[in-house]
């Protein structure tokens, strides 16, 4: 990874952290507003439309503020590197020129002894340092306490540079933490900030000019404002975000389980063949009003769930952006360690040269044990070695003050110089061992980087799958729009069919009244048939009498032959009339039977129509609930798509801004390096201050090792989250397949409803025609009772065919199966609820 991309990614991390915290606060506000009821649904929608604009403005301000912080961190890193190199150079110069260093340290140590013994000072510092790094959670509180103590101790002991140095670092760290949490710094204010940091130390009691200069205080100020406080806030924000996302996911999981249960009910209802044959009925207006009322309540209840799902999708997108940005912090520290490694290599070469020049120094067993001791002893124990060094320098200073030129004192001086050089060599070897440990840490960090690259390669196919899913969602949205239009047309048609059914009910009532009239007419016809039968009996009796008269009048046959012929003709006519009367009687009996059958069939049809109407109402209710659930799912998918697009746009804008900032940073670094080189030349005389800064750098390296451990844990978390995201993608694909199946089932259901509506209209027309034919026939019979005896053969044939068609019509058959299917559907819905 190139060093130019590091500041870009750091700024992106900072900006995304603050935006995530803002969205967390807004999501908590949405949770509280969601419980207030359905009256504030419209207000929540308007607020959600305003929030994205305000969020963009907030993100812009946050980007500007964190650009300034990034500039400061880069300057601090460069200062720390320059201090390390200067300290190492000074240690090597002291080894090469031991007399110069000893004289300087003698003059410096004498001033320290005048005010306060060094043993107490260094002991207090070592205890404070060990206390300072025991617990990372209580770091800020301990620093504030120590800074308060440092002000008191400085007022008492003005000329103590080591104690003043340590306390200045503590006060600076507390001040930088407060500044980073409370103040928004713009890039144009960098010079003012540095001036404020310099002026901050004017409140403390100033040391003499021989001990510490103002340029040195500026260097200390800049070197202490380091990156680790940013990392600490980064981890805390991520933990808060993950915790809130888990809570919101649990709420969404509950709603998702409800939707899955409804989808299972839909599939069971639609796969049942008995239910599919019952989709022939319409809703009444009363039930339709109830359904609309329930639908409005469900929409008001689902507004809050939609808002929560939007917030969760935004947070997930931000977390997905944050996860790769965690790696940038670790890589930043890795580059810092690499630079330290380069410095260590240069120091190793210089050490070899010094060993060649210092072959005269004897290496005894005691020196070897001292070197081992220095390699094992922790960093805060080096202060004790510094104390002994100052004591030896004070003893060396006495011959110069007394001006005794004896050989004994010169030998003591050379022996003490040799001991000082041995201690310097031990310290250099301790630094080399420490750099080796940093190299091992760098290897571990490179391994972690390789793991991160593998994870990124695994993320690429997931990105392609999300893009394909987005395309599928767009196609499904188009199909759903078409289905919504079809639904509106079908609803208009259903309203028309409801009106037609009302008219049919009115006509059926009229038919029942006319049927009652026909029953009265049938009774009168039966009475007439009884009278005709009596007349027939009388005619038979008369015919018998005539036969008896024929026997009596055989004698008169010759006279009455003509009359007999006439009578025979009349008898034949009477016989034909009798046959016609018998046929008419049979026809009337058949008609009465048919009318009774029609009555029973009409009553059965009325019951069937009522049952069908109830079934159609329930089926429409179920279809509406299914469509509502599908619309809700589609809205959530749309919201996720919009959130992804907004995050992509924000990332593109952030990249452009970062490229511009990199150019400004490069120019600023070139000017800053020139200024810092001049200040470092003035600071070479202050070796004790740099030794203290070496101890602090060691502590910072320990912090880096802790950061490496944190990166390991972060990598494990990233792996777990990868698994979770892959599982979620599988769930989304399954849900999309279910939606496609539900869509196909809904289309088939709509087609079946249209076919049933057409069949109902056709049957109603047939009923109207039959009713008109029956009414015409009844009117003709009622108006011409005398002519009713003479019914033509053609009318008889038409009436018989009508009866046959009525018996074989499909409306009289599926009653039992429809009732069974209706009862099954009702039982299932009760069980699910």
Swiss-Prot record:
Any one of the GO CC terms: nucleus
PANTHER family: CILIA AND FLAGELLA-ASSOCIATED PROTEIN 58-RELATED, COILED-COIL DOMAIN-CONTAINING PROTEIN 110
Presence of keyword Transmembrane helix: no
Recorded superkingdom: Eukaryota
Name the UniProt record assigns to this protein: Coiled-coil domain-containing protein 110
Subcellular location: Nucleus
Gene responsible for this protein: CCDC110
Main location class: nucleus
Keyword Chaperone: no
Annotated organism of origin: Macaca fascicularis
